[in-house]
Amino acid sequence: MRGPKAPKDPTKKRPSIYLMLDKNIAGIPDNYGNCRDTNFMEGRLLQQIKGICDEIDDDILKLLEHMDGFTKLVHSIGVSITAQKDEEKDSFITFTMQCYGKADKYGSGTQVTAKCPCNGEEVMIPVDEMNINENDDIIGAFHFDFPENCQGACVTLRFYLNDGYSVPEIEVDPPIDYESNAYDEMIERSLLNLGNVKRLKKAIEKAKRGEKVVVAYIGGSITQGAGAKPIHEMSYAYLSYRGFCERFTDNDGANVTFVKAGVGGTPSELGMVRYDKDVTNFGEIKPDVVIVEFAVNDEGDETEGVSYESLVRKIAKADNEPAIILNFAVFMNEWNLESRLVPVGENYNLPMVSVKQAVVPQFGKNTVITKRQFFYDIFHPSNDGHRVMADCLIHLFEEADAAEMPEEDSDFTRQPAIGADFEDVVLLDRANFEEFATISTRGFEGSDKEIQYVERDLNNFPSPEFENHWAKTENVTDAEFVMTLTCKNIVLVSKDSGSPQFGKADVYVDDKLALTADPLVNGWNHCNPQIILNERESKEHTVKIVMHPGEEEKLFTILGFGVTL
C-alpha cells in the first residue's frame, strides 16, 4: 500500500472535554429486540466530566448546562469506538446524542446521530451541521445502537471546543495491579463487620457437600449490573457468586443457584414489597445467602431506615434461616448511607461490607484504582469497579469460611434499631388480590406496555417489573379504582414516567386524601413506592384512586401494593 505523494499537514487538535474515556459499552437487547447501550446525562453531565478531569473551570462547565451554552462552547463532537473482538472491528455502531426538549421532554428534542466504525477511527460531528434549535433544552442521553454481530466495544467521546476556550490535558491512569499488596489491603478494609457467621458458614458447608444452595442479591441499579459490560457477566453480583462457586464447590457451582433482583432507581421501600416475588418467587426459591445493597438508593426512603430494617427482618424470618450480608456501595462523590444503615447491621451483628471504606481512602493517596477507573458514571461502577465490589464480598466469604462456627444465631426478634413496621409486608397485585381484598377497577382495566424492565438472574435481556398491574384506560374520564381490605399498612407502588400523557392521581384512604401521586416528578419510567397508610392495629380500610381534577383524560398506572395484614 502506497501513501499520498504530498500528505497534508496534520490538523491541530482543539482542546477537548471528555465525556467518556475508554469506557466499555455493550449491546443488550431491550424488550423490542434492539441492542442499545444508553447513558443518561440529565443531572449527571457535569459531575461525569469532573470525574474524568476535576481541573476544568466551573465557568466552562456551566455552559454545558443548556443547549444554548453548548453551541457557544462546543465546535464538534468526537466519537471513537473499538470493538472488543477483532472479528467485530468491521462493524458499525450508531451513536446518538439525544437532546431533551423544553415543551415535550422526550418527544421534541433534536437527535444528533452518526454511524461510527468499530475500528477505533474517530468520527467528527461538527456542531454547525447539527439541527439544534431553540426548542432544545439539555443533553439528555447518549445512545449506542449495536448491530447483531457486535456485542461489546470501548468508546471515547469528547467535545472539541471553539476558539477562545481551553481546558487542562488529562493524565493517563496507570494500570490497576490486582495482584499487589496494596490491592489486598484495600479489599481488607472493606470488611466492616464479620459478625455472626453461623448462617453463612452453614451455607458454605452445604455448598462444599454438593447440596443445593441459593445465593441471592437484592438492591438497586448497581445490583442490577449498571455500568457492567456485559451486564450479565461483569456485575459484582455475578462475579462474587462465581467467587463463591469457585471456592466452595468442586463442580464449578453446578449446585449453586444465582438470583439477581436489582431494580434501578428504587429503594428498600420497594425492595421489601417485591422480595417475595423477585427473590423467592412466593416461596418456591429458598435463598441460603442474601446480599442486600441499598446504601446509595435510600436517600429518598420516606421511612428513613424503617423499610431497610423491615426488609432485613423479613428475610431473616424465613424457615430456612438465610444468611444476610449488608453491602454498602458508594457514589463518585464519596457518599452513601452507611451512617443510617450500619446500626441495623450492628443490632443483629450481621456481616457487613463497605466499598466506601475500601476505595475512598486511596482515592487521595497511595492510589490503587482511580475514580476514573472505578466509576462508569457518577453513580455506577465500571467493570473494574464491579470487580472490586465482588472481591470485597469474596473476602468476606473467605473470612467466614475460616472463622469458628458460632454457638448461637443472631437474635432477629430483638428491639429494632430503627423500626420494623413492614417486616410482614406482602405484595398485592392483579394476580393475587382476591386473596386479600375486594377491588373494583372502573377505567383501570388496561395493560401498560411501557413499565420498567430489568435484567434478572443470569439473563442479558430485560423482563418486566410489576407486570400484574392496573393501568388506566385511555379516553376514560371517570376512572375510579376502589380497594377494600383489612390491614395495618399500605404501600402504593405506581409508575413514574417522563411522558406528558401521564397525569396526577388523588389517593384516598377511608375518604381522606392520603396523597396526590405525580408520575412526572421523577421524570423517568420506574417503580415508585409511597406509603398511604401506617397504623399499629389491623382493621378494614378502603382505598380509592381517581385522576386529579383537570387531568381526567391522562394516564396513570397502579403497579401494585405492599400490605401488612
Please report, for each region that a protein language model flagged, where it lies by residue.
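Structural recognition of the beta-strand scaffold that forms the well-ordered cores
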Residues: 214-218, 223, 257-262, 288-293, ...
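Extracellular serine-dependent O-acyl
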Residues: 78, 99-101, 120-127, 323-328, ...
